[in-house]
A protein has these predicted regions:
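Catalytic phosphate/metal-binding cores of nucleic-acid and nucleotide-processing enzymes, i.e., regions
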Residues: 1-124
């Protein structure tokens, strides 16, 4: 039986859109202005997948999604904000999905330094 690539593509886009909405709702607890960046569906690459945060957020979902590819995509489209990729790995064995945050090391260091200044410095 031939594969219906149009249906597969639509299902994949729907899964991605659902993850973007879910992620935006999760991030609202931290950044109340967080919302799905719907601009990419009209103009392509103009807004992050989740907007209203201090980061350019790229959201990816699938079975073993490409984390480096997600970061590369974010960095190519970013507007100067630090980039993060929030990657949801759907398991094929119906186990709970893994969610990862991928960022450059310098972004991580900036985040830790900002946090440490909020709590009185790092104890090393």
């Amino acid at each position: 039986m031939p594969r219906d690539y149009a249906k597969i593509g639509k299902r994949s886009r729907t899964k991605g859109s659902n993850w973007e909405r879910t992620l935006a709702n999760i991030l609202k607890a931290i950044w109340p202005e967080a919302k799905r960046g719907i601009g990419q569906s009209r103009w392509g690459g103009e807004v992050p997948d989740v907007d209203g945060t201090p980061y350019w957020v790229e959201a990816k979902v699938g079975v073993q999604p490409n984390m480096r590819g997600a970061m590369r995509q974010a960095e190519e489209a970013a507007d100067g904000r630090p980039c993060i990729a929030v990657v949801k790995d759907n398991s094929v064995n119906n186990t709970p999905a893994d969610v990862w945050v991928v960022m450059r090391f310098d972004t991580f260091v900036q985040l830790v330094l900002a946090e440490s200044s909020d709590i009185g410095g790092l104890d090393t």
